[in-house]
Each structure stands twice: as C-alpha cells, then as structure tokens.
Amino acid sequence: MKIFLDTANLEEIKKGVEWGIVDGVTTNPTLISKEGAEFKQRVKEICDLVKGPVSAEVVSLDYEGMVREARELAQLSEYVVIKIPMTPDGIRAVKTLSAEGIKTNVTLVFSPAQAILAAKAGATYVSPFIGRMDDLSNDGMRMLGEIVEIYDNYGFETEIIAASIRHPMHVVEAALMGVDIVTMPFAVLEKLFKHPMTDLGIERFMNDWKKYLENLKK
C-alpha cells in the first residue's frame, strides 16, 4: 500500500519524505489557498520535493475548461496528476486526457457506481471519500470495500486512493481491504506512529539505561 499526504504544506511534505514513507501528495484549491501560495508554483515545489504522483485539481467545471487546464498543469512536471471532479463533463475530460497520456485522479467519489464510471473512462486513480460518507451517517468503509471488490472482479487498472481519512483506523481498514493508496492529512500520519505501550516501553528502557550508567559510576 502506498501512502500519500493530503496537504499543500511544504514542511509537512519534507518531514514525510525524510521519514521515507511518503509516496505522493494530493492537493486541492482549498489546501493551497490555506498556504497563501501561488497555485502553479506550489504544485511545482511539491513535485520537486516528493518525486512521486502529485494530484493538482482543475477549477473549471466544463469539459473544454477542464481539458485546457489539465494540459497546462501537466506541463509543470512529469509527476503531476490531474484531479477531475466526478461529473459527466469530468468523465468526458478523463477519457480525452487518458488518451493523451495525461494521468488523472477522479475526485469527489461517493458511490461504487461513480467509481465504475471513472475506471471505464480510463482514470489513473479514483478517490472515494471515506470520512465525508461517514459524516452523512453512511458507511464509508463499506463503500470502499465494494469498490475494491468490483475493481478486482473486472481487473480495472485504475488505482484506488482512499481519501477523506480521519483517523488511523481508516488507514488500517483500508489496508485490510487491499486498497492501493491511502491519502491522509499530516496529523493522521503522525498518529500512525503512536501507541501508549510504545511510549511506556521507551520510558522504561531509558530509565533502565540511566540506572545502568549510574551503577557504573559507583
């Protein structure tokens, strides 16, 4: 399973890359606007850091606008993946871009039916939103599992990115299902390191080592 960071913050990305566990990044206009950065420049900076897939989202909603934006963004770096919303015009744009060899990520997916359309259009990635489904009192993980099963049934090449991840259990459950990729906020990535028994174990080892050094001085 690959791990992507869902952020536009360069410091967070640097840390993830230094840890050696981040394979890519997903962004959107909201994340980049929070950083106060110029959109295309920030996308280029992220690509220079991560050296892996970096999803950058179009803001047009019509077919022609999406394709035009996508072609421009694709020129920024070989690592750029174009995020396209799950709409009829979006799926049409994905079909066109896929034929041109431009990688795409269909976003705002909330049902297996939508995921089927993304795969049929030749999307490189599809991003079902788990946490947002949970917010609607629906089972986001069940939706994700159904998408995994459908893709396995038909051998679709589109990779599944579990998105809208809220906590470590989302990550674990997605991994158990065999999801290709999980994209998560930096705060969730940090939580993956944590377990109270680990902290207690480290504290105990350090105390024992301190006592050992004190005994050597006697």
Curated annotation (Swiss-Prot):
GO terms for cellular component: cytoplasm. Its EC number is 2.2.1.2. Coiled coil: none annotated. The active site is at K83. Keywords: Cytoplasm, Pentose shunt, Schiff base, Transferase. CDD domains: Transaldolase_FSA. It comes from the Bacteria. It is found in: Cytoplasm. Pathway: Carbohydrate degradation; pentose phosphate pathway; D-glyceraldehyde 3-phosphate and beta-D-fructose 6-phosphate from D-ribose 5-phosphate and D-xylulose 5-phosphate (non-oxidative stage): step 2/3. Its main location: cytoplasm. Disulfide bonds: none annotated. It catalyses: D-sedoheptulose 7-phosphate + D-glyceraldehyde 3-phosphate = D-erythrose 4-phosphate + beta-D-fructose 6-phosphate. GO terms for biological process: carbohydrate metabolic process; pentose-phosphate shunt. Transaldolase is important for the balance of metabolites in the pentose-phosphate pathway. Belongs to the transaldolase family. Type 3B subfamily. This is Probable transaldolase. The gene is tal.
